Amino acid sequence: VTITWNNTTTVDDFGSAGHRLPMLIYKIFRFHEWEQLKTTGQTSGAPIDLDDGYIHFSTSSQAQETADKHFAGAENLYVAAIDATKLGTGLKWEVSRGGAEFPHLYGKLNITDVEWCLPLPLVKGRHEFPEKFI
């Protein structure tokens, strides 16, 4: 693993060599999904993740659109920051919405991979991400 500081990380183990990824990637959880992860220590994801065969994540620049598209109007959500370097070779960057590359984990997410998790409040009909969200 090669790490380049400047709010990004170059990780040779994931995808093509030199692919720049953020140090942190993000997962939006419903309350019961977050509670289950805390209780069991790992998850295979939400129903959509199980259907697709991988756990969906977003970068910081993709997360608001993900919230708007998949969680519009939903309350009791949490956003978790995941250290991408802890996920190993199961993390793949794949083209998805609008031709953008999204991080997908082929495997389980462990609670030890979570750097922090905070409530994602609904403010005036839109989810408001925390200040520490980078």
Name each region found by the language model.
Residues 23-134:
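Conserved, structured core segments of small domains
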Residues 1-22:
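N-terminal amphipathic/basic-hydrophobic helices that include classical n-h-c signal peptides
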